[in-house]
């Protein structure tokens, strides 16, 4: 069982500015989150319904408690503060879920 944070970004008004900020500032901050096991970024995400997403991000921890602790840490607060800046550049939907392998 793993805990995951997922963010779906809509296409930003200025993709170049968004990409530069995300890759130069946000990724280095998020990589320091305690207990982070995996950080995946997907581009040109095709939606089954509606408009495609610009980018999908998935961060994974071993447990929900570890995810919560990471978000409450100084590194988590710094990452969340920067995420607020990203939300000025692109609309984002985010969620947390606990996953269990089905197969």
What does each model-identified segment do?
Residues 1-103:
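Macromolecular interaction modules
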């Amino acid at each position: 069982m793993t805990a995951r944070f997922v963010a779906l970004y809509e296409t930003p008004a200025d993709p170049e500015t968004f990409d530069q900020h995300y890759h130069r500032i946000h990724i280095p901050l998020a990589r320091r989150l305690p207990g982070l096991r995996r950080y995946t970024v997907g581009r040109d995400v095709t939606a089954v319904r509606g408009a495609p997403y610009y980018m999908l991000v998935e961060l994974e921890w071993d447990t929900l408690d570890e995810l919560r602790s990471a978000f409450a840490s100084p590194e988590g607060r710094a990452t969340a503060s920067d995420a607020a800046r990203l939300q000025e550049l692109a609309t984002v939907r985010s969620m947390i879920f606990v996953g269990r392998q089905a197969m």
